[in-house]
Amino acid sequence: MRLHLLLLILLLFSILLSPVRGGLGPAEGHCLNLFGVCRTDVCNIVEDQIGACRRRMKCCRAWWILMPIPTPLIMSDYQEPLKPNLK
């Protein structure tokens, strides 16, 4: 009986402390909600880029979808660095 209890406790801790990270990132979830697909670097010819999923992944969606879905932009605090004016 004690062996079963010990195995059950070890199984519970191994499930709770697993190093696997589940779920999607917020940008990937946003892309899937807009019926998009995360692709590396470039979208197909018949797809429009509607956002970004990760660092080098873009959110692509086919432009001929019958039901129009608004594509809200995700605003971020990042701003491009100012370029010096050369004379």
Swiss-Prot record:
Induction: Down-regulated on the ocular surface following inflammation and bacterial and viral infection.
Subcellular localization(s) per the UniProt record: Secreted
GO BP, sorted A to Z: cell chemotaxis; defense response to bacterium
Predominant location category: secreted
Tissue: Constitutively expressed in all regions of the ocular surface with predominant expression in the uppermost layers of the corneal epithelium and lower levels in basal layers (at protein level). Also detected in some keratocytes in the corneal stroma (at protein level). Expressed in all layers of the limbal epithelium with no expression found in limbal keratocytes (at protein level). Strongly expressed in the conjunctival epithelium with decreased expression in basal layers (at protein level). Also strongly expressed in tonsil tissue (at protein level).
Keywords: Antibiotic, Antimicrobial, Defensin, Disulfide bond, Secreted, Signal
Keyword GTP-binding: no
GO MF annotation list: CCR6 chemokine receptor binding; chemoattractant activity
GO cellular-component term (any): extracellular space
Cystine connections: 31-59, 38-53, 43-60
Signal peptide extent: 1-22
UniProt similarity note: Belongs to the beta-defensin family.
Function: Has antibacterial activity.
Protein name as it appears in the record: Beta-defensin 109B
Species: Homo sapiens
